[in-house]
Amino acid sequence: MDSIWKKRKQQLQDFRRYLNKDNKVKKQEVPDGLYQACPNCNSTIRTLDLKNHLQVCPQCGHHLFIDAYARLDALFDHGKYKEYYTSMKSGNPLGFPGYEEKLEKYEYKTGLHDGVVVAGGRIDHMRTIVVVMDHRFMMASMGSVAGEKITHAIEMATRKKLPLIVFTSSGGARMQEGIFSLMQMGKTCAALKRHLDAGLLYISYLTHPTTGGVTASFAMLGDINIAEPEALVGFAGPRVIESTMKTKLPVGFQRAEFLEDHGFVDMIVKREKMRDTLALLLRMHA
């Protein structure tokens, strides 16, 4: 009897300790990169959901940045393609202070040697050469390597009698390379003229942001110019223009919709329709 009483007493003490215990749920840290905030509507979105929607916000439709390889995976049949000119790396032709260290930093950070990726594959069974500018690497500014890779891609498309698609996204010419950067404008345009003379299709696909010397050269020379929604496309930035001209710019100035209204862009295509639209255009011009 005494042992039963002691056992009962122990159980009551254990129960009281449990009641007095701090039962508050401890705050858990959310792993980095699990969620992202949409810069347009501030919705919190799972990173995996963004990836499945090609980096387009499922709440408001805002187009976030998508890297070159994710775009190529979504564009080519079964995500299969061959990448070209992977060994090209920028030098420092003008001996610009700190430039080599900056290049090394971006190579380590992105895994890229420059901000241009060239690939060949099939879109709806049609062979196509595709160039994608990836602004993770120094805003995909156009230096000698970027211009050389784009020129090589154009010349390969001309030689193989293939259509060419270029996805632009750039801060313009690379100041660290001076005149070597600026000459890429003429070089790429000359290569495009030879592609045009061969009777081949060139589609320029403008993404956010496309500015500077890229806009002033190959970006606006497409047989068909397509843009993603709300992409900024221009030469100088809006703030530079306003401060220089001492005037207020129209609402939406330099955005894709403004350019379409004024005849500089042929169509605006949402990213989810990118592959189907390009496949249709390639089929029409085959």
Positions of predicted regions on the chain:
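Short cysteine-rich clusters marking metal-coordination/redox-active sites
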Residues: 38-41, 57-60
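Cys/His-rich microdomains that often coordinate metals
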Residues: 44-45, 63-64
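Conserved catalytic cores of soluble enzyme domains
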Residues: 171-286
